[in-house]
Amino acid sequence: MKRPLKVKMILPSLDEAKSPYWRPIKYSLFPPIGLATLAGYFRDDDEVVLLDQHVEKLDITDTPDLVCIQVYVTNAYRAYAIADSYRSRGVYVVMGGLHITALPEEAALHADTIIIGPGEEAFPRFINDFRNGCAQKRYAAQWRSIEDIPPVRRDLIKRSKYFVPNSLVVSRGCPHQCDFCYKDAFYEGWKILLYGSCRCGVERN
């Protein structure tokens, strides 16, 4: 598929964001920087839409070439329902995130492709294969680095819907290794961005 792609990137709302016992305002503080970063791997002529269900309504009646869904533990069932709806109409669905990495066999039942681990290395490989009609069922991160990630696609972020639209990622993971926490396993330690990368991010804001 050498023509430009029509892509929809979705962050389904977390269950607790819809609960009357939690403060919904918490979930409109920051935009989905992870998805906006991965969007940087698409070509300039690709038509990419980023939708955060915490701050806007999700329409699943469209038919893009590709739907990318970020999945956490507490939005997994909502993400699966969205994926199943798109796939029932022939739309290709790729899913990644913490829950996908933790339960890949379960997730594979609801996606055409799953990405295990952070997506900065695996996601561009998937995009290249998808364009060439040979996407695999599963991609796993072969390394975990944040040194060469593309600029965040802030043009896709609906800034007026967030309290802190200019948030930056300057590190990933955690310097501690608590047995009960997922972060050490998922991110494989604590990584920080070089000063130059952080400065560029500030200047682009």
Please annotate each region the language model reported.
Residues 12-15, 72, 119, 186:
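Flexible loop residues that form catalytic
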Residues 18, 128-171:
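N-terminal [4Fe-4S]-dependent radical SAM core
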Residues 2-10, 198-205:
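Conserved SAM/AdoMet-binding glycine-rich loop
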Residues 26-30, 74, 114, 118, ...:
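Alpha-helix N-cap and loop-to-helix initiation/capping positions
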Residues 3-29:
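Short glycine-rich His-centered loop
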Residues 3-6, 65, 166:
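Nucleotide donor/acceptor-binding cores
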Residues 150-205:
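Radical SAM [4Fe-4S] cluster-binding motif and immediate context
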Residues 34, 38-148:
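Glycine-rich beta-alpha loop elements in corrinoid/cobalamin-binding modules
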